[in-house]
Regions:
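Short, ligand-facing micro-motifs at secondary-structure edges
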Residues: 120-122, 141-155, 175-198, 212-218, ...
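Sequence-specific dsDNA recognition surfaces
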Residues: 91-96, 111-126, 140-172, 192, ...
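Proline-centric
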Residues: 1-9, 32-34, 47-48, 99-108, ...
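Hydrophobic alpha-helical scaffolding
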Residues: 4, 30-34, 60, 99-103, ...
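Terminal amphipathic helices with adjacent charged low-complexity linkers/tails
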Residues: 61-65, 288, 352-356, 366
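Non-catalytic DNA-recognition/assembly elements of restriction-modification systems
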Residues: 10, 17, 22-34, 41-43, ...
Length: 589
């Protein structure tokens, strides 16, 4: 089977094998990794280095003849004093050869194909604001990826000329290799390049025998190369590629004609991968836009009938609409928005209206002030018509967080002296989440705080809401029953609602699009930050108390369905990943 046929016959597997990244990237599908296409690119390069990508021509001069000429040229350069005689590299044993090569190919150590070295030391005091660019590993990685780099380190032309006397300055068709960080990343030196490089951080392959540099470059981007250099790279937690290790890496060396044919075929197939990748990304973007547009018809519905009609339209295509994690996340956000708009459950005219609830809350707070349990709050202005984003159902009211809160507070800066190996839980931003109010318990810290003062003020109780107020503002954590003694740090706000509001409507509101929009509004300082007064001023739709419970139950029911959908989707995605892996293994073996 040709590689072209391998691509076209299984295009559904290559394009549908997706993986969710842990961190968001650029664009609406920045969190999606096109795993299948990535595996296809790896496969193309792996087939190439094994000599299985293009058929061999028995009339081609074998690689052994080319290697003889290279050895003769090297001996002549030593004789002329242009290069130093190298210590012979170890013979290649049969046990070392990782796979069988086609007839006419040879295994060779990289050091036998050219000269591998590093630069002369450039001291920090020699760095200049302009002059000849001075590249470290990070600049080589950027050059390899984009073909250009915005560099901020330079050396003087005079120093550059003196450093070039050692014969290891970059020249056209030499190959730079990163020695630290992401090791082994190659960059072919172009005719217009003029730069120097950091010793040990970057290695240079001096192409003294005019080997086809594009062929070596393809090998240096293959999985085979990455596996080989990491197998014996120095360092435990940090890998490095040394000159001695690079010298000894085995290279599958093709005949000159095969090298040219392979590079051409790889470029041709990578272009197909580029097209497939662009089509997949465009399809994912179009799908997500369609989902978001249709879901917007639900929140934009003007009445119950229109909402029902729009839902019927979506439900008829449920199995084709909600097929990605992003689309399911959008559905979750729509459910939460419908909930706070009063469109998720029907209103009951027999419910006590929210206006009466607010009166009761006001009376309860007045009593707590009288008993000295809370301080009297400064009254905030009512929610203005300009702030109200939509019309509320009958029986609902607009209010601010401060109207239903006993108090808000944040932790202090000097809690480091209370840190301990065990004791009370210290809730930090690392325990909060963006779209969930369940506390994260995978990154726990402990404190032994004072009994009075800060210890009393920042001690958490069940149903307290903890909110991040610096950096990634608006991340949440709801304190559950049975958590035990716990406190907050200075980057979080403790929001304690009046006991009558201890239900799940309010945590659901705090993770809704309406709340997130308010968290994203104030931008203060170098990092986004939120003051306690900003939290108190958050405006929200307040349903009757009985309806709050019905809404929370319905949200929980629907979000459980969404979680089940996502779980099924992830299982299906895992199957597609296994199929892509199996297809790759089958093609290689």
């Amino acid at each position: 089977m040709t590689v072209e046929k391998l691509i076209t016959d299984h295009i559904d597997i290559w394009s549908s094998a997706l993986q969710t990244r842990s961190a968001a990237g650029r664009g609406s599908n920045g969190k999606i990794d096109l795993y299948g296409i990535k595996k296809l690119r790896e496969l193309i390069l792996e087939l190439a280095v094994r000599g299985k990508l293009v058929p061999q021509d028995p009339n081609d001069e074998p690689a052994s003849e080319l290697l003889k000429r290279i050895a003769a040229e090297k001996a002549e350069l030593v004789k002329q004093g242009k290069i130093k005689k190298q210590k012979p590299l170890p013979e290649i044993s049969e046990d070392e050869k990782p796979f069988e090569l086609p007839v006419g190919w040879e295994w060779v150590r990289l050091g036998d194909l050219g000269l591998i070295g590093s630069s002369s030391r450039v001291h920090q005091q020699d760095w200049k604001p302009d002059g000849i660019p001075f590249y470290r590993a990070r600049e080589i990685v950027t050059l390899a990826k984009y073909g250009e780099v915005n560099n901020d380190l330079f050396i003087s032309p005079e120093l550059f000329e003196s450093l070039c006397l050692n014969g290891l300055s970059p020249e056209t068709n030499d190959i730079m290799l990163t020695g630290v960080g992401t090791i082994g990343v190659p960059y072919i030196v172009k005719p217009y390049d003029k730069f120097y490089f950091k010793d040990a951080s970057v290695l240079i392959f001096k192409n003294t025998h005019a080997i086809y540099s594009e062929y070596l470059n393809k090998i240096f981007t293959s999985k085979y190369w990455k596996d080989e250099i990491h197998k014996y790279s120095m360092g435990t937690t940090v890998h490095t590629l040394t000159i001695s290790r690079a010298n000894e890496v085995l290279i599958p060396f093709a005949s000159e004609q095969d090298q040219i044919g392979l590079v051409s075929k790889i470029d041709e197939l990578m272009l197909l991968c580029d097209q497939l990748e662009q089509q997949s990304l465009s399809s994912l973007d179009a799908h997500q836009q369609l989902v978001e547009t249709l879901l917007a018809t639900l929140t934009d519905s003007q009445n119950t009938k229109e909402l029902s009609d729009n839902w019927v339209r979506i439900s008829q295509h449920f199995d084709t609409l909600f097929t990605t994690e992003a689309s399911i996340d959008a559905l979750k956000q729509t459910i939460l928005q419908l909930a706070v708009m009063g469109k998720l459950v029907p209103q009951d005219p027999n419910d006590e209206p929210a206006s009466e609830l607010l009166k009761r809350i006001e009376q309860e707070k007045a009593q707590l002030v009288k008993e000295g349990k809370i301080k009297k709050q400064k009254p905030l202005p009512p929610v203005s018509d300009e702030e109200k984003p939509f019309e509320l159902p009958v029986g609902w009211e607009w209010c601010r967080i401060s109207d239903i809160a006993m108090f808000t507070t944040s932790g202090s800066r000097d809690w480091a002296k209370y840190y301990s190996e065990k004791g009370a839980l210290f809730v930090t931003m690392g325990n909060l989440s963006k779209y969930s109010y369940d506390l994260r318990m995978d990154n726990l810290r402990y404190v032994t705080p004072p009994v009075e003062g800060e210890g009393l003020r920042t001690k958490l109780e069940p149903f307290d809401l903890v909110i991040s107020i610096t950096g990634d503002v608006g991340n949440l954590g709801l304190i559950p029953e049975g958590l035990g003694e716990a406190y907050i740090n200075q980057h979080t706000c403790l929001l304690r609602l009046i006991p009558i509001c201890h239900n799940y409507y309010f945590p659901e509101f705090m993770r809704s699009p309406m709340a997130k929009l308010q968290f994203n509004t104030p931008q203060r300082g170098i990092k986004n930050s939120f003051r306690l007064s900003d939290v108190e001023e958050i405006y929200l739709p307040l349903p009757p108390l009985e309806e709050q419970h019905r809404i929370a139950d319905k949200v929980n029911e629907y979000l459980l369905i969404c979680s089940h959908l996502k779980s099924c989707l992830q299982s299906a995605q895992q199957t597609r990943l296994h199929l892509a892996d199996a297809l790759t293994d089958a093609a290689l073996n």
